[in-house]
Amino acid sequence: MKRFGRIMFCFLPALLAFGLQQLISIPAVGLALLGGFYTKGATSIDDCMDAFLNIISTANFNAGVSAAYGTVALVVFAYWYYKKFRQTEPENVRKPFNIPVIFGILITAVGLQYITNYIVSFTAAINPHWLEYYSNLVESVGLDEPSLILVLYSVLIGPVCEELIFRGLTLKYAKRAMPFWIANLLQALLFGVFHMNMIQGVYAFVV
């Protein structure tokens, strides 16, 4: 029973992240709905709904919601990880990065970018509709013409949050309940599912 509880606890970080997304998104959509009803020139329900849909489909709206979620999630999960696991980190992990480590990270990042491109191409070849959906998603959040807020979220805040949630908290808890290789597969699977689309899900799982 205790082991089962530990396994179930592995899902808590991902579930909390999903809950935070809804907690941020629902009020934002509510404010957008109010904005639609108070839009100048909207004289009917249809006009108000059109204005509302225009608001929530803009890149700025989606970027703002993403940034708000990312900021809240970063604070929550960084505090959780610090309080629960900071003292268990090896001493060499706590030391500042040196030049060879930074250089190695940069080389790895470039290599992973190439691998990601191949994975995306392979996945899209299996089902072109997956790539079409992903392309529409990228366009809807403004990644084709990113703003400063979206760049900060996509390059810094979002990746750090995801690392804390999955390769941080989820993996740490999973290793308490199962062998490392199963724990690693579980966090990778949850990481992929969390993206809610096949293209990102596949390369998130593999990489």
What are these model-predicted stretches?
Residues 1-103, 110:
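N-terminal, membrane-interfacial amphipathic/helix-forming hydrophobic leader that caps
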Residues 2-5, 116, 166:
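Short, intrinsically disordered low-complexity segments
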Residues 40-45, 136, 187, 191, ...:
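Flexible domain-boundary/linker segments
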